[in-house]
């Protein structure tokens, strides 16, 4: 910064201190300007909080959101494609129902019913994914653009206006000690900045129907989601009711006990050593060289997403990096991946 620039900054700071501490009166902006400034400030705060709350509404599990964010960050660092989406609760429920439905098999009522409801839950999770994408594209992204572009630009104009206002008030206070032309130029710059800031705020507030359109897109996306959800649930309800009707119309089977086993006593001494019992000691795990950062698994960890490292309780994992306060990156059996910190105990810490 030039000497003249430093001098101007010093003058502005002097004027600001004299207003805050000394009670000096600065140039007042008109009420219309102040009201527009207030509305723009409220709009800015509303946009930020509504974006945050919308994401929490669509993805209510904070741990899953944090994990998803970490996975996407790691994928970006490694130059990989975007990681998996948010794990919908419907998808997790569907997975459990389908799994146990297969295990029970088709020769009972509960197993096939679990399969039908599990498939419906899977369809619901896909519809929920579509809702997430629709809301992001037509509601969250436009609000983010409004915040990053228009609102940020207005804040820049207001900051510049405040700087020029301080410069003008400082020179006005020194009227008679500085050339009139210098004071006139300061006033012109102040008026110019006020016009630009006023115009940008006016245009934003005048075009707020765009935000109404974005709200409409949010509501329409939810309406479409609930329509599809109702259709899926109605279809599975019909199938379940039909299954109940068929089961009720069939005669109930009676339990038929099988013949009891008879016990035959053998004569003579038993030839089985130790009465047929044997005991095998469990081998101890081989020793591990503790010459590099490593940790011991406290619990089993089953990877749920690409890039995670699975292990069993007692495994010794070589540490390569700490991703954040919740995740490590390490290697086990030649495989590399990341895992939660609270699943392990440190044996040799990573160097700081």
From Swiss-Prot:
Keywords for this protein: Cell projection, Coiled coil, Cytoplasm, Endocytosis, Endosome, Lipid-binding, Membrane, Phosphoprotein, SH3 domain, Synapse
| One GO CC term, this protein | early endosome
| Phosphoserine modifications at | 262
- Domain named BAR is located at 18-249
Q: Where is this region: Disordered?
A: 1-27, 264-289
Molecular function, one GO term: lipid binding
| Topology in membrane | Peripheral membrane protein
Subunit structure, as described in the record: Monomer; in cytoplasm. Homodimer; when associated with membranes. Interacts with SYNJ1. Interacts with DNM1. Interacts with MAP4K3; the interaction appears to regulate MAP4K3-mediated JNK activation. Interacts with OPHN1. Interacts with PDCD6IP. Interacts with BIN2. Interacts with ATXN2. Interacts with ADAM9 and ADAM15 cytoplasmic tails. Interacts with TMEM108. Interacts with ADGRB2.
Q: What is this protein called?
A: Endophilin-A1
Please name the source species. Answer: Mus musculus
Give the gene symbol.
Answer: Sh3gl2
